[in-house]
């Protein structure tokens, strides 16, 4: 008898959900993280109230064994001795519209929990209670129904019989997919150098799974050189493991759209090489990017009266799934948009619903790691999932950003101004919050007076507006660290968070009542900012600090996640195994530490490309430290000129900042006007990025030198093979800018392990250096030169971070020696 694992909520919602997508209900349960409201109600219920009770059972229906599991919000015994199953829901629906029969799914979920609990405890009957928490009014509305065990059993059996045809479809597909993957062949005639080694590591990690002595299954860090074909080296072995029953679903997680496309292309290659391959995939894209019916401000309007794709969505989705799941399919962004128009359903929600029936899910990191938007249908509990995390060197900073939040006082001031004259509940709440942040700004200035020598006192944005004899009404606790009008605190002051929380309800009321107001977009942005800060406050613990920064009349409040390790660890623990790979994951101890993978295996694959194909040089007589940059400009320009004059072709020069880039470019263009240059501008969109890269043509008729920023969109994730790029210069060791936040990070890790400077500066900087240098050699046939410009590249602290294929680096004393060395290299 076949077995199907099925979360209770998924069973109920799939069968019984009808009607429309309505953000007034579904959206706010997610957006406000209803979990903290659940905890509040559960705590208030008293000692006899069991919260978050895990329930599971095996039931047979239509020759299928269903393994059902879920968590009941609460179970308790009332004053009459009757057991009560409590189902808690948060909603923005007005109180007068909350009725007993508002949503049949809510009763059904409680009844399924009741059926399981009654059977396990031999209860002849019990009560199911629906508890609605109205987020605007804090009103609690409850409804209670009594059921016999027989009624609950019959209800559950009926649901399982209704779901059985869909379960049978899943069973038949799983058999077909497994057989197909078992016969899967590598889609190329032979492995590239290094591919087989990487594939073997990932295959073994997927097979080991949760049998390994590692929380949440096997963790693998795999550093593999650029150009070996990491995407296929990761996907192919993971799919082979799935074909052997090791993994139910594969999640390919990326930091950039370009790597999502690479994963899609790899799957297309597999389908092309093996047309009979039974494999479904879906690419998840942010709702804002795929919305077919945005409002006037360009935001998704997820209300049935505003969006035809939201209206009646749940009445049409099963027909759409029936048609789309008839065979294999690769549902990328374009395919989802086409299907959404065909069936008149929301493309974003369609992608989510399809993901339950697809074997491979491609998406951004946030679908696993972000606590707000992660895929609850998969990751609220653990499963037999395989995680492939591409460009994993980006994950520490991305994870810190996901768990942190930032709020600016000016957004409150501007919102008050936008509302104009007159009184309202919203304006009162905004005024109170604005006043609280004003007092915090005063206290911040007194605790950390600006003393930076780089400050221009004539700049009003940098000048304190607080009279010396003005005492703040808000007293901040003793700071952990203070510098340049920035204060770091161990805990966020409740005097700031409470008034910000109080803004939410009246702000939402105003937004719903004034959808066509001219300032709607501005206040919606404020609403999201308040949400972000209150969400972060819910998960705040010892891995966070509170940052207050005063700039002129502005105050920035940040709940800053310094150490994302426990949060990343918990996310990865939802799966069977996780392979995190990149060209730059050194040193492995750093990534194990900051990503919460202390027991992970780490491998570093040697470059398979001939060492003689890379000319690697360093001029250690140049200092690019901040204090030396102005004096170094001409020396850097001269070195760049020698690099590109040695051979006609396309080159890149990567800098630690835009300001330094512009300084050198201005000098270079004036002194070497015969060399064509191209300068990376900040905030390029996809079209501008593509246009920039299109200038790097194969076998160019003239030399081109592109000026870019390390860690930017051209410093990594760019594949310019062959003669499209034959050399690059790395100007500096890539250290992040020294600022109070980086200094707080340094202090945190100094206290944790004594490696504060390495964790906050040296390791992230060298990561950027190695990524930028990796743009040059992309295939075994490529030849190219890399020039390092900074004296620190000759220091042991940096040399020990060089990859093995950099052993042949040559240190030169002058531009003349560089020119001669390059001539020798290109003449070979």
Where in this protein do the model-derived segments appear?
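A substrate-engagement module of RecA-like helicase motors
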Residues: 178, 185, 246-361, 369, ...
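Conserved RecA-like P-loop NTPase helicase motor core
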Residues: 620-631, 682-793
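Conserved pre-motif I regulatory segment
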Residues: 173-223
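Metal-dependent nuclease catalytic cores that hydrolyze phosphodiester bonds in DNA/RNA
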Residues: 1-78, 82, 108
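Mg2+/Mn2+-dependent nuclease catalytic core
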Residues: 57-154
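Signature of the SF2 helicase/ATPase Hel1-core->accessory helical subdomain module
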Residues: 234, 261, 341-360, 365-502, ...
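Conserved helicase motor "Helicase C" RecA-like lobe of SF1/SF2 P-loop NTPases
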Residues: 656-681
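A contiguous, basic/glycine-rich beta-loop/short-helix subdomain that forms a polymer-engagement track
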Residues: 336-361, 371-378, 506-623, 631-633, ...
